[in-house]
């Protein structure tokens, strides 16, 4: 192989001056070590995809990663409760349930019948529900029913009971939806325990939601979260079950990053005074790392702050952003404020789809067909700034693709694309004025 004269001269210069060049490079590195490290970090990041960069960002945020052997998507209430009931029937050691609402209706009654029977069989059963969520329910658990449940051997407690005049307790509520069985399986997502997930509500029609079931070491994280909530002062009385905590409690909160069949899972738990910004930070990191596609389904998309800024940056980078919200929700103010936010996204280039087949209560996001999140977090002030929330960020293309298929099927069969004409039809002037008034209180909704 022959080189040109200029190339040969370059090689000769480098060989003759190699000692000087090495000394000069060492001086540069010594004086500008921080710059060199930043440059190397940027060069490494250029070779990573969105999932790898997001994992790195999550580790900096202090999130723990867990192994997941299996992820099952439960896209409807009927599928979720059938699967949950079957797993509860097979419980041998303990059952832990933490839900924002246990509505006193047919589906709750059927579940309680199974739990009472399992308690008689010697299985330890613990139920935690949010006190405010119970008062806000159409059919709250009565004191009489709770006493009956305790007599059957099931431990049941209300999280942070409301006591007048301490209304500050209204702000930090237990919004979890968690069921752990024998430390082997966890269910989580957007569904409470109520029969409207099967039969709908008169105001909105069908009530659509989504849950997931996971196994593997990720279950440990949810189990530890349950006991942390159970023990939180003011104490839930009586807590006779506190000495019956499972063997998994007390294990290290962070396990090595390992890839299971379902991929690694990052565990994000919002604790008002410990990790108040974690949901905003994780959503921001995920969206900021997206290269091609962001898909979000969320019922209360009153987006602001970090999440709104991240979506705008994604659109400016040329990332395709698809957002799905419901035509009808369970609050007039919610509909109006969400409408204004969706219009802003639409004007910046996002695809906004209005779901027409009832109320879509799911809380999911998919990034670049590489990873996704499913959990309890709404994109409103209550979830992002006040309540106790938990999300699983699942780094698995197969699970993400399956969620995308559900999204795409809904778009094809149950959705209307938001356009300027559609917005004007849905939001006449009077409603837009009302929405702007409601927006003033958005940070408390």
List each model region and its residues.
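Short, basic/polar N-terminal leader/transit segment immediately after the initiator methionine
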Residues: 4, 29-31
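Charged, low-complexity intrinsically disordered terminal segments
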Residues: 28, 43-445
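Sec-dependent N-terminal signal peptides
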Residues: 32-40
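Cationic, amphipathic, low-complexity segments that mediate targeting or membrane/lipid association
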Residues: 4-8, 19
